Design a protein with these regions (language model features):
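Surface-exposed acidic/polar loop and edge beta-strand patches at domain peripheries
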Residues: 1-111
Length: 111
């Protein structure tokens, strides 16, 4: 899996995203010369299962207890990826997908 980045910027900020998890990787404040957000250090670290740092959470955000839920009287079972629970979309949530960039404009990146 290849980690690709995209950058948009204005006179104040430079924003870098990654295709893995449609992740927000860097929000760099130009005059203060500092990255304003937490990331995993290297974009290559996003290849491996990690915390959802900057990544798109989904299909839902948060934990589903015991990896199961009901709709009406029907019980559904999910894969467990956080002890006995399902976290942030399960084993292959949105944070693990390789997203295709469909538009890069001066002020937006769309995956």
């Amino acid at each position: 899996m290849k980690v690709l980045s995209s950058i948009i910027e204005n006179k104040f900020l430079k924003i870098k995203t990654l295709n893995i998890g449609a992740s927000l990787f860097e929000v760099y404040h130009k005059s203060k010369k500092i990255n304003l957000i937490l990331n995993l250090g290297s974009k290559e670290n996003y290849k491996f299962k990690n915390f959802c740092v900057g990544s798109t959470c989904g299909r839902y955000a948060g934990r589903i207890g015991n990896a199961e839920f009901f709709i009406g009287k029907k019980k559904f079972f999910l894969n467990k990826n956080d002890g006995d629970n399902t976290l942030h979309g399960g084993k292959i949530g949105f944070d693990r997908l390789v997203w295709k960039k469909i538009n890069l404009a001066k002020n937006k990146i769309i995956y």
